[in-house]
Amino acid sequence: PEYRPTVIDTAVLARRLVRDEVPNCKLSTLASRLRLDHSPTHRALDDALATTDLLHVLIERASGFGVLGLDDLVTLSKLAGHPQAAKLTMTTLLPRTPGVYMFCGGRDEVLYVGKASNLRQRVRSYFGGEDRRRIATMLREARQVRHFELPDPLTAEIVEGRLIARMLPRYNRAGKRADKYCYVRLDAAAPWPRLAVVKEPSPSGLHLGPLPSRTMAGLVIEAFHSALPLRRCSTRLGAGYQPPPGASPCSSAQLGASQCPCAGLADAAGYARAVDTARRAFQGDPTAIVERLSARMGELACAQRFEEAALARDRLSALLGAVRRDRLLAAVRRAGRCEVRRGEVAWTFDAGRLVDVSVAGTAGRALPADPPPPPADGRPVGRALVDEALCVAKYLDRNAGQLEVVSCSGVWDFPVAADDALPRLV
């Protein structure tokens, strides 16, 4: 294997740690001013010995910034110049293990919650390459860092989501993102069904979601409309609807892109076939729509209409992503209560909720945040539960080949089958 040693640049470290004590950071100047045991003579051995002496001095100085290991020293060149570098002492007691960290303000309020595979390394990184404006403001307010040490990154991600949902920290945008969740709904039982964006699923109708934004839901609907002549108007059409005399068709119908039953210009049999194709996509089989959209995308690309082809690609990507999320959530719910093991860590899930985690040789441990409650009978699934179930489902799907299923009360469907079109189109 290729030899790739860890590199420590003593010149950069010296500029960060002793720049105010010396006129320049030449090795000869540093050796003289810091009274090193060896002086450089432009000969390999003497210069190497002087550099080693300098490194020992810099390591001693670096300890004042909370440097306790090689990884800390490697990143110090970035950290020491940060406006809030003095607060690096808040990271001194953080372990190099998975967990959840919380930046807290002067009144002990939680400002920001995050997860990490290596708590110490992740928290210290905020004082280096992090350039988001809101994080800079948060660091100015932070007075301490609290943490929960957890057995693995999956548990850390789940606990992070629970804490954000419970505390709604000011600097966590993820905590506010759930309010934007929405669904695409098809009321297939209604006369002349149409697609709509709704905030919550209802007992009747078919739904795709939850989707992260109305923009994404709009792209999904556009994907259906690009492939199927479903009506786009919002007119309520009951079983006995009669179009008013002289009603004019909507613009999409005039262009031949959709049927228009509200103006009496629709073929019931053809419309029923389009609804049946849409229903199959909602139930997890978007093959017909994928084929039509991919063919349309190819035609546009061949005609050098690349912007329109890119829009068709985005619509198709949104549709496949929505179907994929739906499949993952359905799979984790079908699994019921199951115990899964990877290495020394074992998790117990109940319909996508993490209810217990243990490490080999130890009893199950209480988590810092309780799981979201299961949905009441007949009520839509809560957003916190959806987030956690989706997190679990993605992990099980991604790592299915490395997991040992100890028990499962339902049906184990991981890895979830992907559409053949997904790898080449998304």
What kind of region is each of these model predictions?
Residues 1, 16, 20-78:
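Acidic, Mg2+-coordinating catalytic module of metal-dependent nucleases/exonucleases
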Residues 5, 46, 306-310:
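Short, solvent-exposed positions on alpha-helices
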Residues 2-3, 38-40, 171, 232:
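Residue-level detector of short coil/turn "hinge" positions at structural boundaries
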Residues 1-17, 154, 164:
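Conserved DEDDh/DEDDy metal-dependent 3′-5′ exonuclease domain
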Residues 9-11, 32, 291, 295:
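Short, conserved phosphate-binding/catalytic loop or strand-edge motifs used
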Residues 84, 91-426:
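Conserved catalytic/ligand-binding micro-motifs in nucleotide and anionic cofactor chemistry
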Residues 11, 28-29, 222:
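Short glycine-/small-residue-rich flexible loop motifs, especially phosphate/cofactor-binding loops
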